[in-house]
Structures are given as C-alpha cells and as structure tokens.
Amino acid sequence: MRHRKSGRQLNRNSSHRQAMFRNMAGSLVRHEIIKTTLPKAKELRRVVEPLITLAKTDSVANRRLAFARTRDNEIVAKLFNELGPRFASRAGGYTRILKCGFRAGDNAPMAYIEFVDHAEATAPAAEATAE
C-alpha cells in the first residue's frame, strides 16, 4: 500500500530521480527559468524551495547542506550571494509554474518554472543596455 507516500515516481528509480532533480535544480538556479514537463516542474518546486530557504541565512553549515543537495559550488555561491538576499523578505513561494502547451512528440503537458521575481531581476539590466 502507498499510504502517506509523497512525491511522484516519474518512471525512474530513486537514484535516477535524485540525480535528475539535482541537475534540474542547478539549471533553475543558474538560468532562473527552465522549460520542462508539468509533473517534473511540480516536483522540482519541492526541491528548490527548501534550498532558497536555506540560503536566506548564510552560515558554513547551511552552505555545506546546500552543497550536499546540489554537488556544485557555483550553484551554492549563487544561492547564498544572490538568491538568498533577494528573497530575504519573502516567506516561501519563491517559484512560479506557467503552463505552456503540449509537447509535439508525445503530447506531454509542458511548463516553465521560474523564480517569482525573475522579470524584475532581468528588466533593469535590459533598461541599462537600452540607454
């Protein structure tokens, strides 16, 4: 019986799932928006949101926990230097999922997952280059 078992299996074994979400979390932190299937986006939210919460308080212990979950020093640096301070005043809900139709090959529902302030973070840079 599967009573109280949370999370989607996504037709993968546990190590494949863990590696996939570790890579997807790194891509989301690096690019701040990625396109994936809707079920993967919903599960990725459960991985990324605790990382942002961890990054809000900068300590050696939190950096080591973040590294254990991402295995990438570049991602840890961006989490603690940029994303943690950016979301310091927000109490959760750091990501947004936008549905974007269906994939051509297998009709899988697709979605963008991004950080909620992604538009505001990129808009000033675009204005600065226009001037």
Swiss-Prot record:
Pfam families: Ribosomal_L17. One of its GO terms (cellular component) is cytosolic large ribosomal subunit. Keywords: Ribonucleoprotein, Ribosomal protein. Gene3D superfamilies: Ribosomal protein L17 (3.90.1030.10). Signal peptide: none annotated. GO terms for biological process: translation. It comes from the Bacteria. Coiled coil: none annotated. One of its GO terms (molecular function) is structural constituent of ribosome. Belongs to the bacterial ribosomal protein bL17 family. Part of the 50S ribosomal subunit. Contacts protein L32. This is Large ribosomal subunit protein bL17. The gene is rplQ.
